[in-house]
Amino acid sequence: MARLFSLKPLVLALGFCFGTHCAADTVAAEEADGRVAEGGAQGASESAQASDLTLGSTCLFCSNESGSPERTEAAVQGSGEASVPEDYTRIVADRMEGQSKVKVRAEGSVIIERDGAVLNTDWADYDQSGDTVTVGDRFALQQDGTLIRGETLTYNLDQQTGEAHNVRMETEQGGRRLQSVSRTAEMLGEGRYKLTETQFNTCSAGDAGWYVKAASVEADRGKGIGVAKHAAFVFGGVPLFYTPWADFPLDGNRKSGLLVPSVSAGSDGVSLSVPYYFNLAPNFDATFAPGIIGERGATFDGQIRYLRPDYSGQTDLTWLPHDKKSGRNNRYQAKWQHRHDISDTLQAGVDFNQVSDSGYYRDFYGGEEIAGNVNLNRRVWLDYGGRAAGGSLNAGLSVQKYQTLANQSGYKDEPYAIMPRLSADWHKNAGRAQIGVSAQFTRFSHDGRQDGSRLVVYPGIKWDFSNSWGYVRPKLGLHATYYSLDSFGGKASRSVGRVLPVVNIDGGTTFERNTRLFGGGVVQTIEPRLFYNYIPAKSQNDLPNFDSSESSFGYGQLFRENLYYGNDRINAANSLSTAVQSRILDGATGEERFRAGIGQKFYFKDDAVMLDGSVGKNPRSRSDWVAFASGGIGGRFTLDSSIHYNQNDKRAEHYAVGAGYRPAPGKVLNARYKYGRNEKIYLQADGSYFYDKLSQLDLSAQWPLTRNLSAVVRYNYGFEAKKPIEMLAGAEYKSSCGCWGAGVYAQRYVTGENTYKNAVFFSLQLKDLSSVGRNPAGRMDVAVPGYIPAHSLSAGRNKRP
């Protein structure tokens, strides 16, 4: 919920104690001291006059070079004398008269001090019979970082009630600033008060670029609740939102109430959502957001969050009763994430995702969300981590079944469900050796394929011979797999197995030298590495393929013993990987700045196990070259590149190169090109994948155009498709004082082979209060690597380039 403001009750500031030390015979002795402070008190009182009861200028684009609020402490003048004893009050003035225990009047540069609070005023009357103090024509009160100024104040010290007129307040606590003006301020006793005709914001002094205007505000500090009636949000002098009633917390704690609406526009028309927040308990809250999407209809969003020392979670639900655009009913998206720490060694969790139909992401999300949500995860798990048999044991039990969404042609490639999986990994150190065993039992289920169970047991032993200059790590293992397959398609049930030995040796060394680079001292390393791997070739075409897939060939694959993901396929290997990498480390901190590497694999046998399980022949004696380079150059430039080069055909199979320039926060230039000669593009209607060249250029930038205005752009172009994949352009503005920031963004992106979607959204950030519209940060982080929202940049940092 938006945190509007928090006021201190005046009873603490004006709790005067007129004792015998304020008697008439003492007043005369203090007159001389009062004249010393006359100049300061007079100036403060004059500044307190509220001749124009406004927060300041409503100009949105006025310059403020300082960008910082004035200090409230300078507006009140103290007496300069020793501190006042607790519960005693000091009055310093040009003139004082009256009778002790009846009435006292102080005039001329009046300074009243009590318990750290200081009050400046033109005159003050204290009626001891009614225990009431009246001050005017102007007053200024300073206490605990809060400055309250006004014209007149009448206050009953005993009942803690009173009224002030034309009141202006400024406060700063915990780095958060608040200023307000009110026609009247009624003190209702015991921390309760009422403000009428009030305006407030969190901007610098005199800045009213935005504010909240209310007919009245009632606050109860004991309950920590404030209630505003007939409140409007005003931006640039123009009211944007109105509510007849709103409540809010005074102490910064969460409070049930309306949140700021969200507004956007796009291919589906204008969208509006009005959320309401329920603070159900300190560890339990909920949000309900009814809304409307212009061309689709009413929507209802809900979220529940809970947090306990031993468990936490979140549930999200979006429901569209009737989609006018598609004609579908009851479209929805549901999510539930839960984690439970049952004990120090036992954890459990749930990850559940589901949508109503396969077109949900295409209709309501962008291209990246569409590509990343083909198989929606639905998983329940239980994990154990502890000690057993003198070693470390990690075990788990899980059940997993995906919701697979069909492509636009109606075809979907659904993975097997895991019903269930039980896994365990145990290892124990014995000197330089480590012995261990991994085991996994999985029951696979599928509506249209053969079901079965798989047991994998993989015992092994490895040694670690390492020192300061390098390492040698040999390993011996035995990979055993057993299947129990159900009858399917007229075939009887059967059992089958596979046992393969695994031998590999990983070794490397490190050479270092101190040098100078990028204007400072660095350490450069040269790290050659060898990896020998042996696994005999064995036909596996009689084994099912429940979860194995090919991995793309890159630098990391040089050191994998199995190039297939999953346990159904194990490659044949009699090869030696040779590689060398170099790193640049900061000479003072050891932080890595840059690394690059290149490597190749040499084959001693030509056997190869294919994905279908058959054993084929690899006519090559060595693999393609793979290389990479990534890191920072000179503190401003970044590089991230990789290549897979086919030396036989003398062509690149795949490469990507990206460069970035980031001279300062808020200044980002990115360029990235990606090429793949034979990439998996999309799933066709017949169930096969379409492979083609992938050639894409991605340009993005965030750059200041003026001191306050920045541009954000992204252009992602597909050369093979001969069309843009995504285009984005936006402008962000931050006020000079940082009181508010705003952005407007337009986006066009691909949702299918021949379909696009357009979107326009805006955001308005209000300092220390809330945001209006959609928060662009998450989307921009992906679109523009290195992006920082303009309102998050320090004032004055966004200089003209």
Swiss-Prot record:
Q: Tell me the compartments it is located in.
A: Cell outer membrane
Q: Which domain of life is it from?
A: Bacteria
Reply yes or no: does the keyword Cell membrane apply: no
Transmembrane stretches in the record are none
Q: Which UniProt keywords apply?
A: Cell outer membrane, Membrane, Signal
Q: Does the keyword Manganese apply?
A: no
GO CC terms in record: cell outer membrane; transporter complex
The record's principal subcellular location, in a coarse class, is membrane
Signal peptide range in chain numbering: 1-23
User: PANTHER family, per this entry?
Assistant: LPS-ASSEMBLY PROTEIN, LPS-ASSEMBLY PROTEIN LPTD
Q: Which family does it belong to?
A: Belongs to the LptD family.
Summarize subunit and interaction data from the UniProt record for this chain: Component of the lipopolysaccharide transport and assembly complex. Interacts with LptE and LptA.
What is the recorded name of this protein? LPS-assembly protein LptD
* Organism, scientific name: Neisseria gonorrhoeae (strain ATCC 700825 / FA 1090)
